[in-house]
Amino acid sequence: EIDEVVVTGYQNIQRRDLVGSITTIKAKDIIMPSYTTIDQMLQGRVAGMVVTNSSSRVGTAPKIQIRGTSTLQGNRDPLWVVDGIIQEDFQVTLDSGELMTKSLKDIIGNQVSWLNPADIENITILKDASATAIYGSKASNGVIEITTKKNTTDRLTVNYSANFNIGQRPNYGMFNFMNSQERVRFSQEAFDAGVNYIETPYKDLNTYEGILRMLQEHDISDIEYRKLYNDMETRNTDWFKRLTRRSFSHTHNVSVSGGTNKFSYSASIGYNNSEGQEIGNDNERMTGRIALMLRPIEKLTINLTLNGSVSTTNGFFNEVNPMSYATNTNRIIDPDAYYMQRNGYNSKTGKIQTLSYNFINERDNSGSKARSNFMSASLDVNWRILDWVTYQFTGGYSNNNSTNESWATERTYYIANEYRGYDFNSVTPTSAEFKAAQLPFGGILYTNDNNQYSYNIQNKLQFSKAFNPDNRLNALLGMELRSSTAKGTANKVWGYVPDRGERIVAPTIPSEVITPNNPPTGWGILGDIYSRGWQRTDNTNNFLSFFATFAYSFKNRYVVNANVRNDASNVFGQDINHRIDPTYSFGLSWRASEEAFFQKHLKWITTLNFRGTFGIQGNALTRESPELILSQQGVQPGYNRYFSTIGQIPNPYLSWERTRNWNFGVDLELFRMFYMNLEYYTRRSNAVITVDLPFEYGIDDMKRNGGIIYNRGIEYTLSFTPIQKRDFSLNINLNASKNWNKGGETKIDRNTAMYLRGGSTQILKEGYPLSAFWSYSFAGLDGSNGKPMFNYVEVPDEEKSKSIDPTTYLVYSGETEPYFTGGLGFSFRYKSLSLNTSFSLLLGSKKRLPSPYSDFQGSGSMMPDPTKNVNRDLLNRWQKPGDEVYTNIPGLPTWPIEIGWTLPNTDSAESAIEMWEKSDAMVVSGSFLRCRNIGLSWQMKKEWCDKIHAKNLAINFNMDNIFVIASKRFNGFDPELENSIMPRSFSLGLNIGF
């Protein structure tokens, strides 16, 4: 609504006096019971904002982008602001090279994971420079402002709400994998065709290859073999029933509020317990909030708010993925059996080492856990000095403490394979295997503790003066001081025994390890404990800012806005010229509908507003610096001296990233029932890039400014209310946006692998999107053997040269990120019944399909591990001459393997199967339409509520993630998640107030 008051974090101002691109949505309109945080509910709700999920596990934060990508090396997330307080990025001490931390990254959450959606009143998204410039350097990726519910000045009100949610369990009907019979016969056909294995299959009663070898070596009779074969064909183990579940979640919220005009209060407590679809993944969270308002005198208002949150998320060890295992494991395997996973020569004992594996055992004896405790307090003081002058002080403090751990016990295959060398409890202390093991007891534990505290202090002077009803002035002067300190430790220990009081058993001292071959050198595992096991970080970022805003409305139809902010950061320590970053914006709007001509002749045009803005935004990469970054290490073996490593050489010219923004918009409302907004924007960013350095610098690369990024786009929002009566109403909401993104000139050499991989952290080719990728050009299958063939890659050796651009023999496949997003919502009400629907649409992205040969070994030339299942697409592979007319799936790799041949630019070529996997034959549209929610609610009539002494009562039923329409070539996988699915869920809720 044009007359509503917009809370922009720093000030309250009428929307009609704002020129920037702003979208406000009410939290109650987007609540989805199957999600626990507000960021997960935003997909398809706002034009120009792309929300994509990376995992279906509970506790995982989605990826959010507003108006494309404006940085290559920096944080691309929007700035989150809660009740005027900037939420600092949560920094976690995780070693990027440590495999055990990968499972933790998925469940830690983000800046607003602590916030209970039930406490939120509305969400405002700021998109252009005029709207975001007031937030300075942190706002270059857009701003998401959250306003929590305010106190009521009424009698005591108590509200209770509850939601109970059931999520659907996955099943094999959703996917395209072979059943037991198909998998056994596929192995038989491959064996008959002479396809090789990377190593001789083990003798194992759980695999076809295992019993075939046992038959060949006369360990079983032909009759026994046939019986085992028939049993395997009909076993059809349902891994989804063993590893996943119908998840159950429940949420409860209690709130109280009341007070008078002099003093009001509100308090709320929320509890959520959510199970993931994978057995072992769950989240438990409790939140609390207290808000007090005191008005000792008419012109002075004091608000105090306290927030708290305690959360625990359980996940899996890095090598344990139930969903992936269920889809990729051979269904002939008995789920309770231990099958051979490794059978090889142990160089230390001089013996053949046999290790067995059972996934359920692996899952039950490993895991990861993330615990988070969040607390924040804010004080807001408003003093109305004059009727048109207000002073406001805002102070905020927050503390986020997290404890994370990932572990694997001595009972796991991981420990046996990586450290011990034999199955748990399979040898005696006097055996050669035991004496050769440096970790005969215990497993491994990775712990990570983080404490981040930040404060925010604001002093603002706001001027709001109406010279007459049609001329208004709004101005603001302010300063802000922000500081964020993150301290963390990470530690990895060996010998962890959780079932014996969580003790640590010391590894065997290297001098006591008895091995006939290859004894351990140095300290072995003990050396890792001292040199790599422990890590600590202590990082502080300080910002001092001064800002001002100006908004003037003349005759209620001509509006001018101006914003300026100056940020100073300690990131650019020594160079005072780069330490300060001014951001500014200007905007004009013309409310044509207020002109006399429209008022007299075109009254049905209730709103017609033209807007235009320009602004400059800055962005500081807090993890980069123009200074020398030297890491002091321990003692260098062999030299017996302390040593240091260079993380970054000095670059005094490194400065803030800068983005220039233009935005033009039109707001149109007809008959007060049809509202439309159309926006066009352009953005040009000078981003920090990574450049390669000569060998003599002693470091591979450095950061510098100079990566030009262009974004332009169109956004469209429509709201239509064709019927609005007392007992019946219908509302339709539609939003759509298209973003064109491309990189500027780049002089950095790129190899073939970079173009095939694509991505958006580097500019690959001028004029192409940042997420562009290329593929080999598929030329069909060889009719004689089913081998894939390709265009442009085979040239005479004398014509090959390192100077050849890889894109001359690769074909452009598109971009991995969607360039068109949309959302559609219907709201229908009949008396006390309401029906709401929500759809999201993402178009334009391209993805590589999962390859049916992905589990084949030896670069795709050898059969997969017998324990792996394979895609049913291989039933439609090339099998005989003539099949190449009907299929593009290569035949089994029985052709001679080509080794050592090169591409036109002399890069080494991959195998034919690997090239086919990265060819345009395997590129598919990643576009999809998802029905996110269908909700039905019933509101009890007031007279009925009075009979039960209730103020209100509502019952609601919701279905989330009902269906998704995407390319059939995904064969059941969700195009958003690629290798998993978003589970359908059903919920029943109650809301009652007294």
What are these regions (language model features)?
Residues 4, 30, 77, 285, ...:
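Extracellular/periplasmic, surface-exposed regions of secreted and cell-surface proteins
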Residues 1-289, 301-303, 307-309, 540:
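Short, small/polar-rich motifs associated with maturation and membrane association
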Residues 58-62, 103-107, 115, 126-129, ...:
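Short, glycine/acidic-rich beta->alpha junctions
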Residues 169, 173-174, 183-188, 337, ...:
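A subset of solvent-exposed loop/turn segments in beta-rich extracellular surface proteins, enriched
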Residues 159-230, 482, 489-498, 723-816, ...:
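Conserved small-residue
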Residues 82, 105, 130, 213-257, ...:
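Outer-membrane beta-barrel transmembrane strand signature
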Residues 414-416, 423-428, 842-949, 953:
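Extracytoplasmic gating/loop element in the C-terminal half of outer-membrane beta-barrel translocons
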Residues 4, 96, 806-807, 866, ...:
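Coil residues (strongly favoring Ser/Thr
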